[in-house]
C-alpha cells in the first residue's frame, strides 16, 4: 500500500512538472503575442506595438486634447481620460499650472478667441501640438477633437484624426530630439472617432509609416495599448499584415 502511495506521489510530481512547462510555454507564447516590432522600409525607424502603461514609458508621450486645450477637471475634461490624467497626476489637478505650460509653448501659434461659459477661450486649429514638461515627464499635447460650447462634449471623426496626426508628427520631428515617441490608441476615448479598436490601430500604423516615408519622425515609436484592449486587438494578425 505504501508503494502505491509512493507511485501516486511520483506520478503527481511528474504531472506537476509537465503542467509547469506547459504554463511557461503558454506564458512565452502570450508574451510574443503582446509585442511586435515593425521596421519601416526605406528608413531606420522601428515601430513597436505592445500592451502597457503609457505613462511608464521613457521619451515623449503623445496625448490628445480638445482644440481649446481645456484644463478644468470634471467638465470639460474628464479625469478618466488621458488628458485628464495628465492634469491630475502631473499638474496636481491645477488648471493654472497646466494652462501656463501650454500657453508658454503656444505663444507664437495663432488662435481664435471664443466666448464660452466654461473652459478656455483660445481655440486652436486641429493638429496644433504643445510640448510641455512636468518634472522628468515630457508630453506632446495635440488637438484631436472639437468641443460643443454648449454641452462641452468633445467629438472627432476620421478625417479630423488624420489632420491631427499630421500635426502631431510634424511637431514630433521638431521636438523629440531623437528621443522615443510614445502613442496610445488615439481616437478610442470619449472623442469618439467611431472606428473599432483594430481599425484605429491600423490607421495609426498606416499614418506613421506614410509620414515616416516622407520624412522621419523619430527612430523609435512605441504604440502602447491599454490592457483592456487585449481581447479586441489580435497583434498576431497585425504582425502578419505588417511584418
Predicted regions and their residues:
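Macrodomain-like recognition of ADP-ribose-binding/processing modules
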Residues: 1-243
Amino acid at each position: 500500500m505504501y508503494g502505491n502511495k509512493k507511485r501516486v506521489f511520483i506520478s503527481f510530481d511528474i504531472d506537476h512538472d509537465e503542467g509547469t512547462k506547459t504554463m511557461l510555454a503558454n506564458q512565452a507564447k502570450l508574451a510574443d503575442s503582446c509585442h511586435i516590432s515593425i521596421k519601416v522600409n526605406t528608413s531606420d525607424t522601428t515601430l513597436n506595438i505592445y500592451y502597457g502603461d503609457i505613462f511608464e514609458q521613457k521619451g515623449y508621450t503623445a496625448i490628445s486634447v480638445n482644440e481649446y486645450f481645456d484644463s478644468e477637471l470634471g467638465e470639460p475634461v474628464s479625469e478618466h481620460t488621458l488628458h485628464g490624467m495628465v492634469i491630475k497626476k502631473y499638474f496636481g489637478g491645477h488648471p493654472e499650472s497646466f494652462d501656463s505650460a501650454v500657453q508658454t509653448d503656444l505663444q507664437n501659434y495663432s488662435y481664435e478667441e471664443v466666448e464660452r461659459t466654461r473652459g478656455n477661450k483660445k481655440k486652436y486649429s486641429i493638429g496644433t501640438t504643445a510640448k510641455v514638461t512636468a518634472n522628468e515627464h515630457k508630453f506632446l499635447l495635440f488637438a484631436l477633437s472639437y468641443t460643443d460650447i454648449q454641452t462641452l462634449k468633445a467629438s472627432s471623426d476620421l478625417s479630423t484624426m488624420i489632420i491631427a496626426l499630421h500635426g502631431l508628427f510634424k511637431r514630433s520631428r521638431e521636438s523629440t530630439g531623437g528621443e522615443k515617441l510614445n502613442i496610445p490608441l488615439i481616437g478610442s476615448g470619449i472623442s469618439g472617432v467611431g472606428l473599432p479598436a483594430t481599425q484605429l490601430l491600423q490607421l495609426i500604423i498606416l499614418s506613421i509609416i506614410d509620414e515616416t516615408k516622407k520624412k522621419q519622425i523619430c527612430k523609435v515609436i512605441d504604440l502602447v495599448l491599454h490592457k483592456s484592449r487585449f481581447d479586441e486587438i489580435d497583434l498576431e494578425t497585425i504582425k502578419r499584415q505588417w511584418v
